[in-house]
Amino acid sequence: MRVTMSLEALTTEALAAIAAAQDLAALDQVRVLFTGKKSQLAEQSKALGKMDPEQRKVQGAAIHAVREAINAALTERQTALQQAALQQKLASETIDITLPGRGQHMGSIHPVTQVQERICQFFTKAGFSVATGPEVEDDYHNFEALNIPGHHPARAMHDTFYFDVNHLLRTHTSGVQIRTMETTQPPIRIVCPGRVYRCDSDQTHSPMFHQIEGLYVAENTSFAELKGLLINLLNEFFEKDLKVRFRPSYFPFTEPSAEVDIMDERGRWLEVLGCGMVHPNVLRAAGIDPEKYKGFAFGLGVERFAMLRYGINDLRMFYQNDVRFLRQFA
């Protein structure tokens, strides 16, 4: 009877210690004290072997009941302490949801690239292929093959970036047309977008700018076909029916040649591109018989089209990396 009473006292003492534990570390110490290998409960379990069977049965059941009560109290207290610790952590790491979020600014395609892709898409729908070539060009493909004589002003040092007497930064993408004609049999229908370089820098000119040139060579081409193609380009690009005029002009690589103007909202004529029928000397230089084939060509400045489309009066704004400006075209 004395042992049974000590179990009751042990239970009372253990439950009080469990309730008094303020954190998980203290609770673990209580667990070891009352249910560990050296605890009073373990000592009493060892004493069962010295009892007669009937007493062992009764006392064993009592010890088991005490152990279950202590373990249940330990589990309940552990859950409570873990929940309290979690609440304390949440309170210390709370997020002020009234603060504005730090949204990420999405990038976008540069307006010049947008315009270039828009123009190329028009021509690919019309059956043209996109062709590219080297930006460091030789004198032959940049000038001589295009019927540009040695005394032409474009060959001057103040207009062209030369590496040496035979190599330069291309001043137009026309060299791509020559290279294509040298390796491809007509019919040829290509557009050639890319960077070009000239010694010029002001409000409407840049040492580096983008150009798109086009070439169509076949047995039956005409200036009327060229005219219709370019008028359709201008109307689709600017999304309106424009007044367009073709002015007689001169380019060494086309004959006849013309410059194309559109009328703005103020009734002023604005030059937008140049064009013409490919000069027989250019066809001959590329190995194409000018008696059998004819062709037309055209060229335009991408930045020029972008400035007209978006109402920008200074080309240099495209290359100042001002995100406030560029974000308008996202």
Swiss-Prot record:
Q: Which GO terms describe its molecular function?
A: ATP binding; magnesium ion binding; phenylalanine-tRNA ligase activity; tRNA binding
Record keywords: Aminoacyl-tRNA synthetase, ATP-binding, Cytoplasm, Ligase, Magnesium, Metal-binding, Nucleotide-binding, Protein biosynthesis
* Assigned GO CC terms: cytoplasm
According to UniProt, the reaction catalysed is: tRNA(Phe) + L-phenylalanine + ATP = L-phenylalanyl-tRNA(Phe) + AMP + diphosphate + H(+)
Per UniProt, subcellular location reads as: Cytoplasm
What SUPFAM superfamilies has UniProt attached to this entry? Class II aaRS and biotin synthetases, tRNA-binding arm
Please list the residues that bind Mg(2+).
E255
Which cofactors are required for activity?
Mg(2+)
Chief place where the protein resides: cytoplasm
Record InterPro entries: aa-tRNA-synth_II, aa-tRNA-synth_II/BPL/LPL, Phe-tRNA-synth_IIc_asu, Phe-tRNA_ligase_II_N, Phe_tRNA_ligase_alpha1_bac, Phenylalanyl-tRNA_Synthase, tRNA-bd_arm
A Gene Ontology annotation in the biological process aspect, one of them, is: phenylalanyl-tRNA aminoacylation
What is written in the cofactor note of this entry? Answer: Binds 2 magnesium ions per tetramer.
Query: Which family is this sequence assigned to?
Result: Belongs to the class-II aminoacyl-tRNA synthetase family. Phe-tRNA synthetase alpha subunit type 1 subfamily.
Subunit text: Tetramer of two alpha and two beta subunits.
What is the protein name stated in its UniProt record?
Phenylalanine--tRNA ligase alpha subunit
Primary gene name:
pheS
